Amino acid sequence: VNSTQKHSQYDTNWQDEVLKTALVQDYNVSLSGGGDSGSYFVSAGYYNNDGVSYGNTFDRYSFRVNTQGKKGWFSFGENLAYSLTNTDPNQTNTYNDFLRMMPTIPIYDENNPGGYGYGDAAKYNTFGVNPIAREDLEYRHFRQNRLNGSLWLEFKPFEFLSYKFNGGIDLYFYENSWFRGEGN
């Protein structure tokens, strides 16, 4: 048996193992109304994308409120938006890796540290990594919180004179978590 045929009993279809049919969900609800003295708009949303490659997900929660009102010489209002985003991205360039992996390399190999197949660089010059192993052994998570908006107050004692006060906010919090488990 030729040494380059070590894994010849395997016929791994890396594309089928890595790519999948993904579910995308997008839900939104809103409520609005008003009258002579003011109006309002409130909305909330949820978006989820499981991703077409193994180990890739994204979801977002969003909320918005816009109101305005008037009382005598005063007008006031605000526009506020909040979003929370969670992303679990691929750990590697999955598409390059599954194209570079040879079908004679198994996904799992209990003889290797971590139990994943990766081939032998002396025999298989793949220039890729086992994308299933990378996704299973590495954890990466991005979390983003964002609040932005504006508030305003207008004082109009006469038709020809008005004072308008504006304030705004843009807060952004970002968290990146990464963990690498033992194995190849």
Residue ranges, per PLM feature:
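Outer-membrane beta-barrel channels and translocator barrels
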Residues: V24, G35-D36, K70-F74, K156-F158
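Membrane-embedded beta-strand positions in outer-membrane beta-barrel channels/transporters
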Residues: D26-N28, S62-R64, N148-S150, E154
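An active-site-proximal structural segment forming one wall of the substrate-binding cleft
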Residues: L161
